[in-house]
Amino acid sequence: MISKEEILEILNGYDLKNITIATVCSHSSLQIFHGAKQEGFRTLGICIGPPPRFYDAFPLAKPDAFISLDSYKAMLDESDRLIDENAIIIPHGSMVEYLGIQNFEALPVPTFGNRRCLAWESDREMEREWLLRAGVNVPMRFENAELIDRPVIVKYHGAKGGKGFFIAKNKEEFQSKIQQGQKYTIQEFILGTRYYIHFFYSPIREKGYRLRKGTLDMLGIDRRVESNADEIFRIGSVNELEAAGIYPSFVVTGNLPLVLRESLLPKVFDLGERVVETSIELFGGMVGPFSLETIVTDDLDFKVFEISARIVAGTNLFISGSPYSDLIEKGLSTGRRIAQEIALARSMGALGEVIS
C-alpha cells in the first residue's frame, strides 16, 4: 500500500484552489459528480473507451472532462495525468472491484477516505472482529456445518451485489447446495426487515452528533430490490418452486427508500458510533460515507451483518436529499456531503485528515 507520507507529498504539489473531484464512471458517479459541482469543484470521469453517452442525458451530473483508459488497471500508469489535474479520487464499490484491492491500495493519487479500512471491510474474518469489538449484535456463525440446527445463509468469500449467497433450512440442504473448493461463511438466517443505513463520519467537523473526535451524520436508509427473490414467491410456495427447479437468487437490481420508526433512531446512532469509534482504535478510523447492513427483528433489535466503508449505491435514491438529510441541509446527498468535507478540510488546512 502506498504510504500516507507519499500521498501527502503528492498533495503538497497540488494547486488546492483548483482541486478536481474524480471517480470511475459507474455505481454512484452521477451523484458524486452532481454533488461536487454543487460545491464548485471541477469534475473528471474515468472510463474505459469512449465517454458513456448517458451522461449527456444528465447535464447537471456530467463531468467536465473524461480520461479514457484501455483498462481500469491502467489508472496506475495514468496516475501522473490525474495528479496534473489536482485530482482527489472518490472510491466506490465498482471502482474497487474493477481495479482490484491491491491496485487500489497502491494507486499513487490522493483518495478520499482511509484506504486501510478496505482490508477490514473485504475480509469476512476481520470484518466480524471489527463488529464484535464494537459490541454490536451480529448473526450467529457456524464454524462446522454439522452444527447447523436452524435456517442459515451461506456467503462465499468475495460475494457482492447479491451474488454468491444461498439459503439452507438445515444441514442436509446445506450439503446438497454447497460448492466444494470455495471458501464460505455460514450464518444464521435472521427473520426481519432489512435496513441499509447510510452514515457519514467527519473527523474534522464539530457541529452535529458529536463523537470523541468529529461528528456522525445519518443521511438515509434503503433496502435492496433483489432478483428474483422479491417476486419469485408470487408464483408458488417454496416446495412447489423447488420441485420445478426454480430457486431464489439475490442479485441486486435496484433500491427502495425507507424510514425507520423514530423511536429506533437512538439505536441507529449507537450502532454507527460504536463502529466508528472501534475503527479508530483498529486502523485509524473510517472517513466519510459508510453503510451498516442490518436486519431489524420483530423484537426491534438490530443485527448487523455487513459494513460497506464507502459510498453505497443505495444513496443514489437521495440525490436531491432524503427525509433525514433534508433535516441537516435541504437537498443534501451523500455525494454533496463528500464534496463539502473536502472543501471544509481544504479551508482548515486539514486535507491530510480526510485523504489517503
From Swiss-Prot:
Gene of origin? purP
What are the record keywords, sorted? Answer: ATP-binding, Ligase, Magnesium, Manganese, Metal-binding, Nucleotide-binding, Purine biosynthesis
Q: Which biological processes are named by the entry's GO terms?
A: 'de novo' IMP biosynthetic process
Q: State how the cofactor is bound.
A: Binds 1 Mg(2+) or Mn(2+) ion per subunit.
EC number of this enzyme: 6.3.4.23
**Similarity field:** Belongs to the phosphohexose mutase family.
Q: In which pathway does it act?
A: Purine metabolism; IMP biosynthesis via de novo pathway; 5-formamido-1-(5-phospho-D-ribosyl)imidazole-4-carboxamide from 5-amino-1-(5-phospho-D-ribosyl)imidazole-4-carboxamide (formate route): step 1/1
State its role: Catalyzes the ATP- and formate-dependent formylation of 5-aminoimidazole-4-carboxamide-1-beta-d-ribofuranosyl 5'-monophosphate (AICAR) to 5-formaminoimidazole-4-carboxamide-1-beta-d-ribofuranosyl 5'-monophosphate (FAICAR) in the absence of folates.
The protein depicted here goes by the name: 5-formaminoimidazole-4-carboxamide-1-(beta)-D-ribofuranosyl 5'-monophosphate synthetase
Which annotated residues bind 5-amino-1-(5-phospho-beta-D-ribosyl)imidazole-4-carboxamide?
27, 94, 255
> What's the source species' lineage?
Archaea, Methanobacteriati, Methanobacteriota, Stenosarchaea group, Methanomicrobia
Q: Which GO terms describe its molecular function?
A: ATP binding; ligase activity, forming carbon-nitrogen bonds; magnesium ion binding
User: Could you tell me which residue ranges the ATP-grasp domain spans?
Assistant: 116-333
What reaction is this protein's catalytic activity? 5-amino-1-(5-phospho-beta-D-ribosyl)imidazole-4-carboxamide + formate + ATP = 5-formamido-1-(5-phospho-D-ribosyl)imidazole-4-carboxamide + ADP + phosphate
For activity, the cofactor(s) needed are:
Mg(2+); Mn(2+)
Mention any Pfam family matching this sequence: DUF1297
| Top-level taxon | Archaea
What residues bind Mg(2+), as annotated?
Answer: 293, 306
